[in-house]
A protein has these predicted regions:
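Conserved donor-binding/catalytic core segment of Leloir-type glycosyltransferases
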Residues: 4-6, 181-199, 205-208
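N-terminal strand-loop element at the rim of the active site
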Residues: 5-13, 18-20, 26-68, 161
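Short His-centered aromatic/hydrophobic patch
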Residues: 91-97, 114
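Donor nucleotide-sugar binding/catalytic pocket of nucleotide-sugar-dependent glycosyltransferases
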Residues: 138, 142-179
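Aromatic "clamp/platform" in nucleotide-sugar-dependent glycosyltransferases that forms part
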Residues: 250, 269
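Short hydrophobic beta-strand element within catalytic cores of glycosyltransferases
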Residues: 286-290
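Conserved acidic donor-binding segment of nucleotide-sugar-dependent glycosyltransferases
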Residues: 301-303, 307-314, 322-329, 343
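A short, well-ordered alpha-helix in the C-terminal region of glycosyltransferases
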Residues: 316, 323, 330-344, 353-356
Length: 363
């Protein structure tokens, strides 16, 4: 089967790029499909994640004013589809333009993959004008979402967000599942994500300032793209926790960092899914997470393989971290269960669902 993915880019260090590298590579290498990916303005850029050598990349150059940009986008997509004649198309574009593709391309089975929550469109402290504009855009997306053969989301929360008749839930697959697991003996708590309001590291740092008062020999390590505007470095100094917090840029092999950690802290205010949660669990690391939309409640079985804390309850989040920090036996028990429970996200389980969906539509 010939499968075409349409996305903005695959060269970044984000969750969508990581997930696409796993899915597309598994479809090509293990299931034997012919996989193509079309990206925008990425020619010559180096890849952060590894993609199968069997995958064929196609580049569409789009630039200029909005009218010129859209025209180049439409023409580029039509030309590639006409040349490749794929059996099925999957659109991984969280912007508005991708929603119009069923109306603009030849009649080929087409799927939309939604990788983010609707909440992300509103941003931080939106003005009334922005709220109205985003609300109208989401209404348009809801209408256009019905034009796809399938609209695939990641969590049950997303189903409630969209309420579409053609909706289906397929979670993200794991990008790794090490044979070994963390010893959970290092006095390190890990967090992973970009320095944005969404990721809630300001909340985590406030909790950490309380924790180190009684556990000064523990360290918090945060991996992710830094942004001085978010004020994280300043907050670390303000809270006087410089000796207990280390901040790193993204690393391709995050598994080694999970394996050297004992607890994973997930402080997001809202999410699309929470890839790093299942990655930590794959390394046998117990997680403490806010019960934010969307993802954590689908992933964590609270009090079994980690802790789910009411969103915004910093005191409870702090207490749950302390429970794991101060109880090696509890860490071992939850970490072992996490590694078992997370197997439902293995590629052979998740990508099989995609394979079945593609085959059902391409009949």
């Amino acid at each position: 089967m010939k499968i075409l993915y349409i996305t903005n880019g695959i060269h970044g260090a984000g969750g969508l790029e990581r997930v696409l590298s796993v899915k597309a590579s598994y479809l090509a290498d293990v299931l034997g499909h012919e996989v193509h990916i079309v990206v925008l303005n990425n020619k010559g850029a180096s890849l952060f994640y590894e993609f199968s050598a069997k995958i064929q990349l196609h580049h569409v150059v789009v630039n200029g004013n909005p009218i010129s940009y859209i025209w180049q986008y439409i023409k580029g997509m039509r030309d590639i589809v006409a040349t490749l004649k794929p059996d099925v198309i999957s659109v991984c574009d969280d912007g508005l333009k991708g929603f119009f593709l069923p109306l603009l391309l030849p009649k080929i089975p087409i799927i939309y993959e939604r990788h983010v929550s609707k909440q992300m469109a509103f941003g931080v402290h939106p003005s009334l004008l922005k709220k109205l504009r985003v609300a109208l855009q989401l209404q348009l997306m809801n209408w256009l979402g019905r034009t796809f053969d399938k609209f695939v989301v990641l969590t049950q929360d997303n189903v409630q967000e969209w309420k579409l008749p053609n909706i289906q839930v397929i979670a993200n697959p794991l990008s790794f599942y090490p044979e070994n697991q963390s010893s959970l003996t290092n006095k390190t708590v890990i967090a992973v994500g970009k320095h944005t309001y969404q990721k809630g590291f300001d909340r985590l740092l406030q909790c950490w300032a309380t924790i180190v008062k009684t556990n000064p020999d523990w360290s918090l390590e945060i991996y992710g793209k830094a942004d001085e505007k978010q004020g994280m470095f300043q907050l670390v100094k303000q809270l006087q926790i410089e000796n207990n917090v280390r901040i790193f840029e993204p690393v391709p092999d995050i598994a080694t960092r999970f394996l050297a950690s004992s607890v994973f802290a997930f402080s997001s205010r809202f999410e699309g899914f929470g890839m790093v949660l299942i990655e930590a669990m794959a390394c046998g690391v117990p997680c403490v997470s806010f019960d934010c939309p969307c993802g954590p409640k689908d992933i964590i079985r609270s009090d079994e393989d980690g802790f789910l804390v009411p969103n915004h309850d910093l005191d409870d989040f702090t207490q749950k971290l302390l429970q794991l920090i101060e109880n090696q036996e509890l860490r071992n028990k939850m970490g072992a269960q996490a590694k078992i429970n997370v197997q439902r996200y293995l590629p052979e389980v998740v990508v099989k669902q995609w394979d079945e969906l593609f085959k059902s539509l391409a009949k």
